[in-house]
Amino acid sequence: MIIKKTILMTLFLLTSFFAAANIKLPHIIASRMVLQQKSECTLWGKADPNEQIKITASWGQTAQTTALQNGTWSVKISTPEYGGPYYIDFAGKNVLRISDVLIGEVWLVSGQTNMEIPMVGWPPYDTIQGGAQALAAADNDNIRFVMLQQKASFDLEEDNNCWWTKATPENCKPFSAMAYFYAKKLYEETGIPIGVIQCCWNGCNTESWIDLETVKTVPTLRNAVAEYERCKPLQKQLEDWVKSHKTITLNSDWRKRYDGVDFFDKEAARLSYADENWKEMELPCYMDNREGIGSFDGIVWFRKWVDIPIEWVGKKLILSLGPIDDMDITYVNGEKIGETLGDGKWNHSREYEIPAETVLSNEMVIAIRVIDCGNGGGLCGVKEALCIYPEGEEDKAINIAGKWKYLPTAEYKDGVFYSYDLKTREYYNRPEVPVVLNMKTISAAYNAMINPVKNYTICGVLVSMGESNVGRSTEYLKLFPALATSWRTAFKNPDMKFYFSQIAPYPYQAGESQCMREAQRRCQALIPNSGMVSVLDFGNRYGFHYAQKQQAAERFAAWALNDVYGKKCEVSGPEFSQMIIKGDKVFLIFSHVEGGLVCKGKHLTNFQVVDAKGVAYDAEAEINGNVISVWAQDCKSPKNVRYAYKDWVDDVTFYNGAGFPASSFTTEKKLIDTAEY
């Protein structure tokens, strides 16, 4: 589920050049970058101790500094009003020049998959509405972006392997669709060059993006902090052990990364391979935290002997495996029968044909190489989806869920696969660490992704996260403001704009998305200089990811255009502000009513009234000017109102005249982490 555009030769030359020089710059300070206009921007890097460094910018600014004893240096340089391109010279014992630098507006975008999904989407399920047309026209030298490498660390890191690029149809393919549409809208409205720092990681927990000292202020995470600090030295031992193994070389073309790759484990596919010493796992399941494997990213083989009816011998069969997170190459009796490779296929069901000539007896062995690059991993559907049957005779299917043999043969860390010896089952010698380092570990993404760029001057941030924290909504009232505090401290900008979107409706197993949306709604009042985007009307019943990235991006842009760029406009849907109860009716007053309150449908939907015992009744509602009256025939003494307060909402009709939907809300004061109302 990770997309990276790899330009290996360019990167090799770039890093080699810097490595050979006395002056060294972090990856984010490079040609094609965008610097924040009319600001005191920080430039920094490394040099020899006590080396004198002079910075000369072609817009007429200079600065001088001396490297400290540890070789680090930094300077402030004034930037003019937007324009360019410019160059900057760094002169010490050697001279470096970075060129094609624009002055404009810089935004950092961060979050989970809805912010990360690229312009090409993850078809066939996760597509971008209007994406193909927008991508074809995405040729704008004034929109530039840098994608930070997804990485987790226990230690504060100084650099992140990334590079700036310009918006072209090819370059934009792996770039965040939400971020591109946001930058496009800002540029169209202002004419100012836009730079975007993409800092996303699907499946991340919010606490992973917060620095450790700030995490310590969240009471519910104290035990996690203690465990984190205890395991930090153990993690170093594990990383050293993992990285002592040989690496698996992937293809340089990100679209064909895994095609024909040698994983050094093909023997595991053989019919005669001896797997009696492998451990067993019940499938289907996510591999995370299963006994014997824990939270693991990499390659895991699964094998199972299956008995089939004798009359099936010599017939074409269908093997159904359900969805596999992320990718797979599947074999039967040692012959490859199918594969699903590439990004965004983690929730795609697998059905492969077994050729008749492969079905030689009433016994067969199924071997699956699962490639997991993040999050849960494994055969993760329902039991009924794991089956085998003759073509056209699904009613005769034999279920193959249950115990499978398994063995991890490679581990994925920091974008690299490290191979474990298949013959010696080397994985079983892997050092154990109670806290697994990944995108869910407290402070891990902050350390490796935010800390390396915290000196870069930005205008503000866009955030779309919270899905991985569903079920912890009460905690989120402290956790999410802590994120804003952490980043404003890191970027040394206490008033930095902080715009965020709610999670979209989705039928979570626990039925708690409405609680998270309510926590996020309340966070807007807890975070100064923030703005919230409602995507209540973009829910996708079949996945977390919605297709309307352009519309969501333009809702984000409305906040920036109004707050930062002086384009006075509505920024939000109707926002509940006051409740008045008169008899059996409740009257709701709203702010953000530009163009009046609007019903986009035959009538307002999704309203409920709640009595003193907390019992909710479906209610009728009508608009009277900027007030909505709500009532239910079976509730004569209403005490509270809920709007769209359920995990799945698909009939949204409540908007303002500017076209923004209202957020779901409840007037109840207590936020409860449960779906049982």
Question: Residue locations for each model-derived region?
Answer:
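Short, aromatic- and glycine-rich surface loops/edge beta-strands on solvent-exposed regions
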Residues: 83-93, 365-368, 639-645
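Ser/Thr-rich low-complexity repeats and stalk/linker segments
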Residues: 22, 28-105, 376
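C-terminal beta-sandwich/jelly-roll accessory domains of carbohydrate-active enzymes
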Residues: 587, 592-677
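Beta-strand-rich ligand-recognition modules
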Residues: 60-83, 323, 331-384
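Catalytic cores of secreted or luminal carbohydrate-active enzymes
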Residues: 237-283, 518-589, 593-605
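Non-catalytic, glycine-rich low-complexity segments
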Residues: 21-49, 99-109, 116, 282-296, ...
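An acidic-aromatic loop/edge-strand motif
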Residues: 96-166, 197-286, 360-446
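Aromatic-lined ligand-binding clefts that engage carbohydrates, nucleic acids, or primary amines
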Residues: 278, 306, 312-334, 366-368
